[in-house]
Amino acid sequence: MKKVKVCAPGTSANLGPGYDIFGIALSKPYDIVTIEKVDEFGIKITLEGEKAEEIPTNVEENTAGVVAKKMIEDFKIESGIHIHIVKGIKPGSGLGSSSASCAGVAFGLNELFELKLSKLDLVKYASLGEAVAAGAPHADNVAPAIFGGFTLTTNYEPLEVLHIPVEIDVIVALPNIQVSTKSAREILPKEVPMKSMVNNVGKAAGMIYALYNNDLDLFGQYMSKDAVVEPCRAQLITGYLEIKEKLKDLVYGVTISGSGPAIIAIPKKEHVIDIKNIFKEVYNCPVYYTRVGLGCYIEEIE
């Protein structure tokens, strides 16, 4: 095996009250990550696609490069590699752009060098790259990027991830607004009132109950009622409260995707066209009608 091509999905984290815990994989958008063995030792990174020119190719500064370097060191891989990433997920979108690249590289290296790592191990490696983007390792995006479906990152030391396969249609809008992951974290409160904590724990628990009972109405209702993170981050996304009000009768639920500015909604199917039109009317932005999808998968092997 000389080369692998991996499809690495976009993801949506938090889903309202599940801050830093909940995440889902999306069928689109996605990155394509190709890893090829080369004679020259070291790691070469090239990029194309969404804002590729703004992403560093230096191994130490690139999220996927950090993952590759650590795996090569840990498994004493002697071959050089060329990583080529086609960015289909816009960086800074709130759709797990850096996570997709990290997950795609971890998944691809595991296949290319037959490392036989578990999905949980792949999440551990992929989360190391997130420290470059967010300042500390986070798994709420890389976990669904690896596992697919709906994931809960319930612990970090040791890392624990729970996986629930689900089939849910979603609409994701990507307003042309700049929101960095770091600034979106800095705006959050350092302390949370007990009342807000109780609200979020209750709503998050209710969302899991709703999943197991195929109750989209309840799932979306609770997804829309985060009392801690969304009220802060809504300030960073012009028009968010307006869009939430306009969509309230057309969707089961709507919330900010990850750090934003992406907005994710669970549509009532008869209103999909209306929802897309409202997003375009308010933001004039790309809108994806997609569904909860698979984790990383091999698209091609040579």
From Swiss-Prot:
It is found in: Cytoplasm. It catalyses: L-homoserine + ATP = O-phospho-L-homoserine + ADP + H(+). ATP binds at K90, P91, G92, S93, G94, L95, G96, S97, S98, S99, A100. GO terms for biological process: threonine biosynthetic process. InterPro entries: GHMP_kinase_C_dom, GHMP_kinase_C_sf, GHMP_kinase_N_dom, GHMP_knse_ATP-bd_CS, Homoserine_kinase, Ribosomal_Su5_D2-typ_SF, Ribsml_uS5_D2-typ_fold_subgr. It is an enzyme of class 2 (transferase). GO terms for molecular function: ATP binding; homoserine kinase activity. Pathway: Amino-acid biosynthesis; L-threonine biosynthesis; L-threonine from L-aspartate: step 4/5. Its main location: cytoplasm. GO terms for cellular component: cytoplasm. Its EC number is 2.7.1.39. Gene3D superfamilies: 3.30.230.10, GHMP kinase, C-terminal domain. Keywords: Amino-acid biosynthesis, ATP-binding, Cytoplasm, Kinase, Nucleotide-binding, Threonine biosynthesis, Transferase. Belongs to the GHMP kinase family. Homoserine kinase subfamily. NCBIfam families: PRK01212.1-4, thrB. HAMAP family: Homoser_kinase. Catalyzes the ATP-dependent phosphorylation of L-homoserine to L-homoserine phosphate. This is Homoserine kinase. The gene is thrB.
